[in-house]
């Protein structure tokens, strides 16, 4: 047994108990302790409350004056009547290296001991990727089950500056360097473009510019991309006619060339005052007169397209973004040059393509294994071979981490990015597509998606609305654990869910202190050093004005 810390007293059940703390012991909030139930089985629990009681001063009728008189009267004997009492929440009964539900109450008078580091390590396990240590036990390493983390999805939630990006970087390191998995990070702010892994440096980091194949967009997606309001239905109608016509007549074009062809067609409509367009339904070209009041409508579309090309022409590509993903690496999609609406379009198309290719590959693989007909087996093998050739990373499971997930899947809003994220959350485990969502405002994140993130890494959250929202969306998160979250320090987290054997308060490793063959880990996302910047500006200004000031 470890250190003897107290004796069970008062009301005790199969879910909780109190114990009087040994005066020579040091017992903190969150400490792990063990005792025996009435059947003699070892029971593990955590200290949830610690209170100090003095029986000589505990009268409810006491006021300041009477307390002062009592202190003077009792003198040194006060200390002899003082007691520190701890309340314990029972986590379970220990069976081998597992915890099972405890269904037998604790007997008064049982001795309570601190749980040993070895016992805790055995329970938390030694398999998986290492993310940190128990907050109160730095020798107990916390590992996350990779299968559960990826296939059942996860969320990293916290206020700004609490350590979200650091936690994500530690997870990436574990999956890419330790396991050899493939990770994609959708990065709205460019926080990971300078990512450097401890063991391999930048060798396993693939930076991909967030661009989009214009030819893959439908009319509504194109309207969103170039900034036509969803309420501008007439503009969207004419854009739809023109877009379908241009794509039909110029099937070999892509990228900016296709947009230039679209501009040519719109200008032709204005100059001829006639709309000639392709009707997919009838399978032929049709024409109608362009009413004079609609000329300005079309000019508005032209203005939007030209402005888009001027400001964002560099995000248009004819290359396939999904084909750029490299297996066994962290692939950072840099979305920072885009505005939020454009990000949603790019992310929606990208995730849809990733998911569809994974579904196609896994369905072909399963049918190939079951099929007895050589002809059918050859067909399925051809599908797999084509994907392995064009999209080598998608022949294997993949994890997609969505930073600032509330941008792409906001509560109460419909968009393509949110719909495909929801589908991955529901069906991704069947096809080897894992989803990780990261957010500083969980209450703004789609509740259905958040609830399907079956492991939650929750750093400091102080907003009551965010706390209530996370609690509502988390079956594994108890109210008392939620109470811990507001008091967490930077880099400290509550981890609950299927990737960890039981909930834990964890000190997550500092990624920038993880040392390997390539040095220490690095990533962006730090706050700007405002004071240093201002001091530098002041020095430059003082020097230019030749003023004598001490710094």
Swiss-Prot record:
Catalysed reaction, written as an equation: Couples ATP hydrolysis with the unwinding of duplex DNA at the replication fork by translocating in the 5'-3' direction. This creates two antiparallel DNA single strands (ssDNA). The leading ssDNA polymer is the template for DNA polymerase III holoenzyme which synthesizes a continuous strand; ATP + H2O = ADP + phosphate + H(+); Couples ATP hydrolysis with the unwinding of duplex DNA by translocating in the 3'-5' direction
Enzyme class: isomerase
Gene3D superfamilies registered for this protein in UniProt: P-loop containing nucleotide triphosphate hydrolases
InterPro entries: DSB_Repair_Helicase_HerA (IPR053659), HerA-like (IPR008571), HerA_barrel_dom (IPR018538), HerA_C (IPR033186), HerA_central (IPR002789), P-loop_NTPase (IPR027417)
Known regulation of activity: Helicase activity is stimulated in the presence of NurA.
Matching Pfam families: DUF87, HAS-barrel, HerA_C
EC number(s) on file: 5.6.2.3, 5.6.2.4
Family matches, as PANTHER family: HELICASE MJ1565-RELATED (PTHR42957:SF1)
Annotated family: Belongs to the HerA family.
Quaternary state and interactors: Homohexamer. Interacts with NurA.
Name this protein carries in UniProt: DNA double-strand break repair helicase HerA
Name of the encoding gene: herA
């Amino acid at each position: 047994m470890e250190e003897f810390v107290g004796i069970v007293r008062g009301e005790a059940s199969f879910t909780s108990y109190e114990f009087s703390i040994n005066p020579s012991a040091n017992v903190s909030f969150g400490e792990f302790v063990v005792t025996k139930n009435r059947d003699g089985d070892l029971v593990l629990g955590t200290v949830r409350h610690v209170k100090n009681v003095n029986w000589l001063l505990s009268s409810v009728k006491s006021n300041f004056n009477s307390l002062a008189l009592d202190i003077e009267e009792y003198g040194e004997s006060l200390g002899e009547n003082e007691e520190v009492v701890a309340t314990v929440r029972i986590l379970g009964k220990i069976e081998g290296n597992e915890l099972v539900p405890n269904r037998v109450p604790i007997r008064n008078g049982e001795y309570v001991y601190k749980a040993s580091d070895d016992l805790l390590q055995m329970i938390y396990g030694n398999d998986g990727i290492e993310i940190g240590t128990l907050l109160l036990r730095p020798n107990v390493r916390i590992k996350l089950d990779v299968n559960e983390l990826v296939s059942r999805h996860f969320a990293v939630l916290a206020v700004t500056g609490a350590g979200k990006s650091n936690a994500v970087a530690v997870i990436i390191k574990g999956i890419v360097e330790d396991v050899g998995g493939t990770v994609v990070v959708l990065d709205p702010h460019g926080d990971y473009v300078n990512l450097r892994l401890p063991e391999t440096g930048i060798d396993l980091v693939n930076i991909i510019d967030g661009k989009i194949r214009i030819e893959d967009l439908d009319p509504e997606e194109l309207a969103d991309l170039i900034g036509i309001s969803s309420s501008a239905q007439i503009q969207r109608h004419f854009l739809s006619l023109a877009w379908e016509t241009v794509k039909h007549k110029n099937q070999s074009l892509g990228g900016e060339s296709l947009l230039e062809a679209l501009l040519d067609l719109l200008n032709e409509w204005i100059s001829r005052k006639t709309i000639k367009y392709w009707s997919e339904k009838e399978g032929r070209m049709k024409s109608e007169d362009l009413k004079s009041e609609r000329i300005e409508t079309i000019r508005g579309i032209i203005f939007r397209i030209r402005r888009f090309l001027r400001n964002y022409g560099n995000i248009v590509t004819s290359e396939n973004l999904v084909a750029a993903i490299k297996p066994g690496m962290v692939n950072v999609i840099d979305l920072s040059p885009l505005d939020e609406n454009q990000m949603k379009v790019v992310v929606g198309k990208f995730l849809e393509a990733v998911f569809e290719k994974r579904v196609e590959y896994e369905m072909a693989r399963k049918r190939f294994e079951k099929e007895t007909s050589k002809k059918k087996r050859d067909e399925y093998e051809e599908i797999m071979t084509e994907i392995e050739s064009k999209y080598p990373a998608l022949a294997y499971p993949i994890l997609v981490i969505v930073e600032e997930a509330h941008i792409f899947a906001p509560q109460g809003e419909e968009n393509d990015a949110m719909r495909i994220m929801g589908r991955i959350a529901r069906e991704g485990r069947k096809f080897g597509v894992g989803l990780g969502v990261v957010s500083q405002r969980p209450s703004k994140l789609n509740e259905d998606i958040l609830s399907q993130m079956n492991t939650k890494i929750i750093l400091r959250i102080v907003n009551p609305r965010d706390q209530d929202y996370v609690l509502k969306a988390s079956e594994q998160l108890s109210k008392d654990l939620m109470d811990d979250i507001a008091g967490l320090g930077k880099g400290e987290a509550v981890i609950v869910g299927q990737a960890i054997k039981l909930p834990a308060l964890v000190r997550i490793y500092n990624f920038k202190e993880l040392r390997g063959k390539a040095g220490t880990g690095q990533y962006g996302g730090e706050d700007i050093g405002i004071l240093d910047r201002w001091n530098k500006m002041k020095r430059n200004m003082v020097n230019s004005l030749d003023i004598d000031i001490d710094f």
